[in-house]
Swiss-Prot record:
Residues at which substrate binds: 203, 667
Enzyme Commission (EC) number: 7.2.3.1
Record-stated family: Belongs to the H(+)-translocating pyrophosphatase (TC 3.A.10) family. K(+)-stimulated subfamily.
Complex formation: Homodimer.
Activity regulation, short description: Requires K(+) for maximal activity.
Protein name stated in the entry: Putative K(+)-stimulated pyrophosphate-energized sodium pump
Any single Gene Ontology cellular-component annotation: plasma membrane
Residues the record lists as binding Mg(2+) 2: 233, 236, 451
Species of the source: Leptospira interrogans serogroup Icterohaemorrhagiae serovar Lai (strain 56601)
Length: 704
C-alpha cells in the first residue's frame, strides 16, 4: 500500500470517528436522566440561548473573514508569477490552495462549535446520573472537533497535492509545493480572526460578568441573575473551541507545508512520492494512535479526572513514537541531501521523536506553573492575603519564570533537529510535536464543554450534587487547557521556525549576518511587533469590557427585581455587545499581521524581512508563554482559595478575583493570539517569497 492511499484512508477514518462521536453525543436526550419538566425546560432554554449566541457570532465573523479571504486571494493572483515554472501559474494555484485552507478551517470551526453547544447541555444532563457519564459526554464532544479537524486538514492537503501533481506532472515538485503552502496561509488567516475575535469576545463577557457580578454584587459565577452570564458561556465556545481549533489547524497545515517545500528541494525525496509525503504520514498515523488512546478515557465516580486526561497525552505520545519507527523504516528513503548536507532516514525519525517528547515536556512544565497542586500557584494564592497588588506581582513573576524551561526545551529540540537533519529536521520536529493533535484538541475542547455544563447546571438550579460533578470536570479542564496553551505555543514556535527555514531555502538566502544593518533593523522591528500586537488586543478587551460593565450595571439599576430573581436580565443585549466589539476590534490586529510582511518584503527586501521574522519569533514565544501562564496561574490561585484556603467572599478571594480578571486577556486573548502572529507572518512571507525576490527592496534600490 502506498503513502497516498494510507493518508486518504487515515483522514477518512478520522472523519468517520468524528461522525460516530457526534451520533453518540446527540443520542442523549435532555430530560431522560432525571429531573422534572421545569428543570428540562430551563436546560433547553439556556442551551438554546448559548447555541444561538455562538452561531450568530460565528456567522458574522465568517462574513468579515470572507472579505479578507477575497482580498488576499486577489493579491496572491496579482503578485505571484514565477518565471521558472513555465506552464504553471503560481498565483492562481496558490490562491486556490489558500481559499481551500480557509474554507476547510471555517467548516472545522463551525462543526466544533455546533457539537460543543450540543454537548454542554447533555453533559449537564449526564451529570444528574453520574460523574463517569458526564465526563464521557464532554470528552466525546471534544473528540468530534479533534478528529474532524485533523481528518479534514489532511484530506484537504492530499487532495490538493494529487490535483497539482496530476495536472502538471512535468513541473518541478518544489514549485507545486510552494503553491500548496497557500493552504497553510488560508488556515492561519482564519485562525487569526478566530483567536483574536474569539478572545476579545470571551474576555469582554468574562471581565464584565466578574467585575459587576462577583466583585460588586457578590453573586456567584454563572448566576442567572447576572446579565452577562450567557455571553460569558457563549465566549467559552467562541474562544476555546473555534479559536483553539483554527490555531492548531493552522499549525498542522503550516508545518506540513514547510516540510514539503524544504523536502521538495532534495532530488531523492522529489523522486519518491512516499518519501516526499512523509510529513503527511506523521499527522496521518497520529490518528489511529489517538483513536486507540481515546478508549482509555474513563473515570469512576470518585476518580481523578485530571489524571484520566493526562494519560491520553502520555499514551498517544508513546504510541506515535512506536508507530513512526515502522513508518520511517518503510516509506522514507535511506538517505538524501539538502543544502549539501547528507541526511539519513534515522536522522529524520530522531528529529520527529525529539519534537514529540519536547511537546510532552512543555505540557508537564506548564502544568507545574499553572496547577494549584504545585508551589507556584499556591504562592500566588498566599500573596492574595495582602491584597490584589501582591497577587498581581506574584502572578507576573510566575509567568516570566515559567518561560525559562520551555525555551530551553525548544532550543534543545531546534539544535538537535538541525544537527541531524538541517532545516528539514526542524520542520519534522514541529510535525512530531503536533502529531497527537487529534487527542490534544479533544482534551482542549473538553474544557469549554464541561465549563459550559457547569454554567448551565448553575443557571438551571440543578442542585449541589450535579454542580459538584460539573465543577470537578471543569477544574480538570482548566489545567488541561493551560497545558494545551503551552503545547500550542511550543508548536507555533517550531512551526514558525520551520516556515522561516522554508522561506530562507526558497529565497536562496544562504547566510544572514546579525550585524548587517538591514538584518539588525529587521530584528529590532520584529521583536517590537508582538508587544504592539499584545497592546492592541489587551486594549480591545479593555474597551469591550468597559461597554459590558456599563451595560450590566445599567440593567441592575433599570430592571427591577433582578437581584430577587423576580425578573430576567436582558441576556441578548450583552451577547450583542460582545459580538459587535469583537468584530470591530479584530480588524486592526488582523491587518497588522497580514500586511506587515508584505510591506516589509516589498519595501526593504528579503534580508530585512528575514530579520523581522526572527525577531518576532524570539520575542513572541517568550511573551506568549509568560502571558498564558500568568493568566493560568491567577485563575487557578482563585480556584485554590475557593476550595482550600479563605473561601468565596473572603478578602483573600476578592484580591484573587481581581488578579484572575486581569489575567483573563493574558491567557485567553493576547497570549494565544501571539501564536498566530509568528506563524502567519512566516507563512505569508513564504507564500510571497518569489515576489520579494523579484520586486523586493524598493527603498534600498532607490538609495543605491
Amino acid at each position: 500500500m502506498n503513502s497516498v492511499t494510507i493518508i486518504i484512508a487515515m483522514s477518512i477514518l478520522a472523519i468517520v470517528t468524528a461522525v460516530v462521536y457526534t451520533l453518540k453525543v446527540t443520542s442523549i436526550k435532555v430530560g431522560t436522566l432525571g429531573g422534572n419538566e421545569k428543570e428540562t425546560k430551563k436546560l433547553l432554554e439556556i442551551s438554546s440561548a448559548i447555541s444561538e449566541g455562538a452561531m450568530a457570532f460565528l456567522v458574522r465573523e465568517y462574513k468579515v473573514i470572507s472579505l479578507f479571504i477575497a482580498f488576499m486571494a486577489v493579491l496572491i493572483v496579482l503578485l505571484l508569477d514565477n518565471p521558472g515554472s513555465e506552464g504553471f501559474n503560481d498565483g492562481i494555484y496558490t490562491a486556490i490552495a489558500f481559499v481551500s485552507g480557509a474554507l476547510i478551517s471555517c467548516i472545522s470551526g463551525f462543526i466544533g462549535m455546533k457539537i460543543a453547544t450540543a454537548g454542554n447541555v447533555r453533559t449537564a444532563e449526564a451529570a444528574k446520573s453520574s460523574m463517569a457519564k458526564a465526563f464521557r459526554v464532554a470528552f466525546d464532544s471534544g473528540a468530534v472537533m479533534g478528529f474532524g479537524l485533523v481528518g479534514l486538514a489532511i484530506l484537504g492537503m492530499i487532495v490538493l497535492f494529487l490535483v497539482f501533481t496530476g495536472m502538471y506532472p512535468g513541473v518541478e515538485k518544489h514549485f507545486l509545493m510552494e503553491s500548496l503552502a497557500g493552504f497553510g496561509l488560508g488556515g492561519s488567516a482564519v485562525a487569526l480572526f478566530g483567536r483574536v475575535g474569539g478572545g476579545i469576545y470571551t474576555k469582554a463577557a468574562d471581565v464584565g460578568a466578574d467585575l459587576v457580578g462577583k466583585v460588586e454584587k457578590g453573586i456567584p459565577e454563572d448566576d442567572p441573575r447576572n446579565p452577562a452570564t450567557i455571553a460569558d458561556n457563549v465566549g467559552d465556545n467562541v474562544g476555546d473551541v473555534a479559536g483553539m481549533g483554527a490555531d492548531l489547524f493552522g499549525s498542522c497545515a503550516e508545518a506540513t507545508c514547510a516540510a514539503l517545500v524544504i523536502g521538495a528541494t532534495a532530488s531523492a525525496l522529489s523522486g519518491s512520492v512516499d518519501a516526499l509525503l512523509y510529513p503527511l504520514l506523521i499527522s496521518a498515523f497520529g490518528i489511529p494512535a489517538s483513536i486507540l488512546t481515546s478508549f482509555l478515557a474513563r473515570v469512576k465516580e470518585d476518580g481523578n479526572v485530571e489524571s484520566a486526561l493526562k494519560v491520553q497525552l502520555w499514551v498517544s505520545t508513546l504510541l506515535v513514537a512506536g508507530i513512526m519507527y515502522f513508518v520511517t523504516k518503510t516509506f522514507m528513503v535511506d538517505s538524501f541531501e539538502i543544502a549539501g548536507k547528507t541526511i539519513t532516514k534515522w536522522d529524520v525519525y530522531i528529529s520527529m521523536v525529539v519534537g514529540l517528547f519536547s511537546g510532552m515536556f512543555i505540557g508537564i512544565v506548564t502544568e507545574y506553573y499553572t496547577s494549584h497542586s504545585y508551589k507556584p500557584v499556591r504562592e500566588v494564592a498566599e500573596a492574595s492575603n495582602t491584597g490584589a497588588a501582591t497577587n498581581i506581582i506574584y502572578g507576573l513573576s510566575l509567568g516570566y519564570h515559567s518561560s525559562v524551561i520551555p525555551v530551553i526545551l525548544l532550543v534543545i529540540t531546534i539544535v538537535t533537529a538541525n544537527l541531524l537533519a538541517g532545516m528539514y529536521g526542524i520542520a519534522i520536529a514541529a510535525l512530531g510535536m503536533i502529531s497527537t493533535i487529534a487527542i490534544g484538541l479533544t482534551i482542549d475542547a473538553y474544557g469549554p464543554v464541561s465549563d459550559n455544563a457547569g454554567g448551565i447546571a448553575e443557571m438551571a438550579e440543578l442542585g449541589k450534587e450535579v454542580r459538584d460533578r460539573t465543577d470537578t470536570l471543569d477544574a480538570a479542564g482548566n489545567t488541561t487547557a493551560a497545558i494545551g496553551k503551552g503545547f500550542a505555543i511550543g508548536s507555533a514556535a517550531l512551526t514558525s521556525l520551520a516556515l522561516f527555514a522554508a522561506f530562507i531555502t526558497r529565497t536562496h538566502t544562504t547566510s544572514l549576518e546579525v550585524l548587517n544593518a538591514e538584518v539588525f533593523g529587521g530584528l529590532m522591528f520584529g521583536a517590537m511587533l508582538p508587544f504592539l500586537f499584545t497592546a492592541m488586543t489587551m486594549k480591545s478587551v479593555g474597551k469591550a469590557a468597559v461597554d459590558m460593565v456599563e451595560e450590566v450595571r445599567k440593567q441592575f439599576k433599570e430592571i427591577p427585581g433582578i437581584m430577587e430573581g423576580k425578573n430576567k436580565p436582558d441576556y441578548k443585549r450583552c451577547v450583542d455587545i460582545s459580538t459587535s466589539a469583537a468584530l470591530r476590534e479584530m480588524i486592526l490586529p488582523g491587518l497588522l499581521v497580514l500586511l506587515t510582511p508584505i510591506l516589509v518584503g516589498y519595501l526593504f527586501g528579503v534580508k530585512t524581512l528575514a530579520g523581522v521574522l526572527a525577531g518576532a519569533l524570539v520575542a513572541g514565544v517568550v511573551l506568549a508563554i509568560s502571558a498564558a501562564n500568568s493568566g493560568g496561574g491567577w485563575d487557578n490561585a482563585k480556584k485554590y482559595i475557593e476550595k482550600k484556603a479563605g473561601g468565596k467572599g473572603s478578602d483573600q478571594h476578592k484580591a484573587a478575583v481581581v488578579g484572575d480578571t486581569v489575567g483573563d486577556p493574558f491567557k485567553d486573548t493576547s497570549g494565544p493570539s501571539i501564536n498566530i502572529l509568528i506563524k502567519l507572518m512566516a507563512i505569508t512571507s513564504l507564500v510571497f517569497a518569489e515576489f520579494f525576490v523579484q520586486q523586493g527592496g524598493l527603498i534600498f534600490k532607490i538609495f543605491h
